[in-house]
Regions:
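Structural core segment of the AMP-binding/adenylate-forming
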Residues: 1-64
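Adenylate-forming
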Residues: 17-33, 157-160, 173-205
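A short helix->loop->beta-strand "cap" motif at the edges of active sites that frequently abuts
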Residues: 39-43, 151, 197-200
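Conserved pre-ATP/AMP-binding loop-to-beta segment of ANL
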Residues: 53, 57-60, 65-91, 98, ...
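Conserved S/T- and glycine-rich ATP-binding loop of Class I adenylate-forming
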Residues: 86, 92-95, 127, 133, ...
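Short coil-to-helix segment of the ABC ATPase nucleotide-binding domain corresponding to the Q-loop/switch region
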Residues: 105-106
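Conserved AMP-binding/adenylation subdomain of ANL enzymes
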Residues: 110-126, 133-175, 181-191
């Protein structure tokens, strides 16, 4: 994994690296310490968590720096963006070689907006976030769904059907997303112990 992180950060010309210090069993801070010296183009690192590699700053410091950017500058930068400008590079898992970057432009946002309208997503919806956010499915159907509608996401570090359905009951989760294995686990564990759920929609990829 450290080799993949080293390659993708360097190959994408990343200048700002934002990461959790740890997520589930993965120690990202340790990875950065191991390979970070190989990133001459990285100008700043922002860490969510207490384990911060040398030269990095915390999330609150990063947000505070935004107060130095004027509304006029922000508006000018926003106006300069075209729909066909690159927005995100999502990398493959690199199962046969090094990860390959798939470039998506800003029209992705319009596509996601249209899906939220089709599904009737509102600010009152609550999503369960257990899909990897560096994959297209998790990024669009969970992260962007929430960002574009102002809803809420309950994040999980790993997939655990029992824990997710328990949280769905207590947090009022209305949306679940997943693959056939996710849904198979959900159906199995809920049949064994039914919950009072507020679910109204699920997506299957």
């Amino acid at each position: 994994r450290a080799e993949d992180v080293q390659y993708t950060v360097d190959q994408s010309d990343t200048s700002t690296l934002i990461f959790n210090d740890k997520s589930g069993p993965i120690d990202y801070a340790a990875m950065v310490r191991e390979v970070g010296a190989e990133w001459p183009k990285v100008e700043r690192m922002v860490v969510l968590g207490d384990d911060r590699p040398d030269g990095s700053i915390g999330w609150s410091e990063f947000l505070a720096a935004g107060t130095t950017v004027s509304d006029e500058t922000l508006a000018a930068r926003s106006a300069a963006v075209r729909f066909d400008d690159p927005m995100i590079i999502i990398y493959t898992s690199g199962t046969t070689s090094l990860p390959k970057g798939a470039v998506h432009n800003h029209s992705v946002i319009r596509n996601v907006v249209e899906r939220t309208q089709m599904h009737g997503v509102t600010v009152d919806d609550v999503h369960a976030g257990y899909l990897p956010l560096f994959h297209a499915f998790g990024y669009t159907e969970v992260a962007l769904f929430t960002i574009l509608t102002g809803g809420k996401t309950v994040l999980f570090e790993t997939f655990d059907a029992e824990a997710i359905l328990d949280a769905a009951e207590t947090e009022g989760i209305t949306f679940l997303h997943g693959f056939d294995t996710h849904w198979g686990d959900f159906l199995r564990v809920n049949a064994a112990r039914p919950r009072q759920l507020a679910l109204r929609l699920g997506t299957l990829a």
